[in-house]
Structure formats: C-alpha cells, structure tokens
Amino acid sequence: KHDAIAQKLAKMAAQTFAIEAMVRYTSSLVDLDKKNDIRIEAAMAKLWGTERGWDIVDDTMQIRGGRGYETAQSLEARGEPGIPVERMMRDCRINTIFEGSTEIMRLFIAREALDPHLKIGGPVLNTTLPTEVRLKAAVQAAGRYALWYPRLWIPFLTCGSDDVARPFRREARRIRNDSRRLARRLFHAMLRHGPKLDKKQVLLGRFVDAGAELYAQTACLAWAGELIKKGEAGDAARLVETVKHFCQLSQATVKELFREVGRNSDSGGYQLARKLIHD
C-alpha cells in the first residue's frame, strides 16, 4: 500500500530477473560455441550483477528496518520469520570486491572496448610519433571511420530482428539507438582526450555502466522472449510487465549516464582529493 516500499519491491523484482537473464544469456553464448570469446559479456554480468545484487540486499535491509540487523536465530527466538538479512549483507557485499573489484572490472571492460579503436586511431593521436607515421595512420583511420561513424547517426525504426518478441519491439529499438549513441559518445571522448583517456577512469566507468545497462536490457528481452516462445513464461502478462519496467528503469539510468559524460565534477573532485591527501 505504501508507494515508497512498492517501488522498491518492483525494482528488486525487475533487477532480480535481469541478473538471472544476464547469467543465462552469457552462458548460452558458450553453449553455442565453446570457443566463443565472452570476456566482455562475462565481465559485464559480474560487474552489473554484483552491483545490483548489493542494491537489492540494501533495499531489503531498508524494508526490514531494525529486524534486518538481527540474526535468523534471534528472530526465530522471538517468534518471527528467520530472514537472515544481516548474513545476506555480509555475503553479498564482498562480491563487489572478490574476483575482480568493481573498479577493476570497469577498467578491464573499457580497455577491451577501446582496444580495436586504439589500434586504428592511437597512432594518430600520439604526439610522440613522427609526423609521417601519424599521417599514414590518419589516412588509414579516415578510410575506416568514413563508413563506420556516419552509420552511428542513422536512427533505427525497426527492432533489428524478427526474433524479438512482439511485446518488446519498442524496447529493442531503444537499445539499438542507445547503443549507437554510446559508440558516438565514446568515439568523441577518444578524439577529445586522446591517449589520456585511459586516465579518465570515472569517465570510462560511465561508458562501461551504460554498456552494461544495455546488455542487461538485451539479456532480459532475449530470455523473456524465449520463455514466451516455449510457453514457459507462466504468467506471461506479468513477465512482460516486469521486463518493461526493468527497461524503463535501465533506460533512465543510461540517460543519466550520458548526461554525466558531458557534465560532471570529475576534475574538481580529483583536484580536491589530491589536496586532501597532501594535507
């Protein structure tokens, strides 16, 4: 009945579905071909899943209130359900640190995403190289990006595949267009910062987080569509509602991340931190 709690429950349900969808989707890539390179997909699933898993447990603690701090044994001794939220917090929080901390995972994904572009455009932006080397690299890069970059500005009016379940065609179109917007923003950042981009860890993190959100949306559409196709969706209407709600939440996050790429306080925060440390 209370809107504040209801919104938390809806978000928790949607994100729980998305976490499982990402795991299933990533695993299916290996099932299709054992030689598939899923480093980026697996890293995104780990990064996004552990972050959202912690958010879910944190919201659970907020909902449970003081009872969340009690052990299951203490709750049961008082005649209440033994929900071990305090244990969930201990077990879940460490996941954002072990097997690749959140910060390391973001840098790894960013490096993998940038590597193909840096191989092409890196020499052009590297002022330490001889002029003739940079000019030759510029000609090669121009030929590559003359076709690639303009396509990023073409809006897509279709979902891109007839395999996308009909209820999710609109969400699929948004994912395609946001993916191209992400590629444009990342390319612009490369041109602006050049080789120094790898030092902009927080900026790169925003690109990675946006990509992870889009991957989560894609996984949700794929898994939900498969469940509907096989008749294993159970309450299909609720499944569609859950997926659409998740995509709305995720799209809002992507929009905010794109805004922060252009408007942020990163430089001021970095300078302040240096002064605090030196003091």
Regions found by a protein language model. Give the residues of each.
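Flavin-dependent oxidoreductase catalytic core characteristic
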Residues: 1-279
